[in-house]
């Protein structure tokens, strides 16, 4: 069980889960391994106890534990039944529940048979999109969890943001650590871009060797357990080649933010000599590559994003993009490097938009591209991302697609260096770091 003194609040997610407390739907927390799902369940149990719920009303089961290794859906049901307290409402917390075969039968029975409130976590999307949808007929709420945002990274690493006067008469933001050492906010952001946002990094400190060990463990668990072992348990054996899986993973990591044709990936890997193996014959088919990519998407290692034709008002089927769930994992796979930082910060912005509740797509207008169209209910936001707006050529490149859009929704350009102007004909130029730490 997690030691509670190590827990730090993730209010974005805790508030979401509290909002659905004591409602009928099963609360399902999804996300990549080690992004904080178990800690979120523990935080929820602490919240319950603070509001008067007693220990005997709470049942916690983490199916990563050897104690539950051979549990079936029948023994799962009987175990829970034995812990029911008569005439009291029960609160069930099931961590990585998908490791129990036919778990959904048992969970659905708990919902029907007992006076209970159910919370579960899972590290693959297959459990939610397939079995769960069938057995619970929509009676579930998904809380999608991600690694730390930049704002959370500051909190987890005990940085405090303070505003100080700048030489030009304005203000600038600096980060102070718990030893009262101060850093430019950009320095801390560079650390975030290097180490990523996995919560475990905060436990070991910003140490590159230790970070690589932690990230290697996450990668190995996702690839070996969540993908290869899961495929074997399903009996389908669609994803069986760990070398091909790693090469596709590295290819996608190296090409975040690029338009990708699935049919070309196999040829690219072969042409670059990345699949040299005397036992492997031919080029992986587009179907095989897509199957492997789907497995990576189901494990929340990558997220895909589709293109939207702004004038035609329809989604396009080809040349979507992929973003990696944590930039630290990308650095683990490819090595720490400074090049391609533009796509890396684009990656950060994409996930920040998801955290803020937006549905995100790529915008196409004529032969130009808008980095992101972010939609939420009746709201829409067009976003361009670039490292600097100081060059006239860059300003033209980033502003022209937005200027072509004929509607009144907000349009912004996010950059690390905004230049002197804060607005261009109604298009806002916003400092990326200010935006990331804003509400």
Mark where each language-model region is.
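Accessory nucleic acid-recognition modules appended to NTPase machines
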Residues: 203, 208-379
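Structural recognition of the conserved hydrophobic beta-strand(s) that form the central parallel beta-sheet
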Residues: 117-123, 144
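Interdomain motor-coupling "hinge/lid" segment immediately C-terminal to the ATP-binding subdomain
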Residues: 131-254, 258
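Hydrophobic positions on the alpha1 helix immediately C-terminal to the Walker A/P-loop
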Residues: 40, 44
């Amino acid at each position: 069980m997690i030691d509670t003194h190590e827990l730090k609040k993730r209010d974005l997610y805790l508030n979401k889960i509290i909002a659905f407390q004591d409602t009928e739907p099963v609360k399902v927390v999804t996300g990549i391994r080690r992004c904080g799902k178990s800690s979120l369940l523990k935080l929820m149990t602490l919240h319950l106890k603070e509001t008067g719920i007693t220990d005997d009303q709470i049942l916690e089961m983490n199916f990563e534990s050897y104690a539950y290794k051979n549990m079936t859906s029948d023994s799962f049901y009987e175990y829970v039944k034995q812990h029911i307290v008569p005439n009291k409402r029960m609160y069930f917390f099931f961590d990585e529940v998908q490791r129990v075969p036919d778990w959904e039968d048992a969970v659905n029975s708990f919902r029907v048979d007992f006076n209970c409130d159910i919370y579960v976590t899972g590290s693959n999307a297959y459990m939610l999109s397939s079995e769960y949808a069938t057995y619970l007929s929509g009676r579930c709420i998904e809380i999608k969890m991600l690694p730390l945002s930049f704002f959370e990274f500051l909190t987890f690493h005990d940085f405090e943001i303070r505003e100080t006067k700048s030489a030009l008469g304005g203000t600038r933001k600096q980060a102070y650590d718990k030893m009262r050492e101060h850093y430019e906010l950009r320095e801390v952001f560079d650390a975030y871009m290097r180490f990523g946002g996995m919560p475990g990094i905060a436990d070991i400190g910003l140490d590159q060797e230790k970070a690589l060990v932690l990230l290697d463990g996450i990668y190995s668990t996702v690839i070996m357990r969540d993908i290869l072992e899961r495929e074997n348990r399903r009996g389908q054996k669609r994803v069986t080649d760990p070398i091909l899986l790693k090469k596709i993973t590295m290819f996608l990591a190296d090409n975040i933010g690029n338009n990708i044709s699935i049919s070309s990936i196999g040829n690219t890997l072969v042409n670059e000599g990345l699949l040299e193996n005397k036992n492997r014959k031919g080029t992986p088919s587009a179907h095989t590559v897509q199957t492997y990519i789907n497995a990576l998407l189901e494990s929340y290692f990558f997220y895909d994003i589709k293109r939207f034709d702004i004038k035609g008002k329809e989604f396009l089927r080809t040349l979507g993009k992929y973003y990696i769930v944590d930039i630290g994992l990308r650095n683990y796979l490819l090595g720490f490097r400074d090049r391609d930082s533009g796509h890396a910060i684009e990656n950060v912005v994409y996930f920040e938009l998801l955290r803020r509740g937006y549905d995100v797509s790529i915008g196409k207008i004529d032969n130009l591209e808008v980095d992101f169209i972010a939609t939420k209910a009746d709201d829409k936001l067009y976003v361009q991302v670039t490292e600097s707006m100081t060059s006239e050529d860059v300003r033209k490149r980033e502003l022209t697609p937005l200027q072509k859009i004929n509607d009144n929704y907000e349009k912004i350009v996010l950059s690390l260096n905004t230049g002197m102007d804060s607005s261009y004909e109604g298009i806002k130029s916003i400092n990326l770091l200010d935006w990331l730490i804003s509400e």
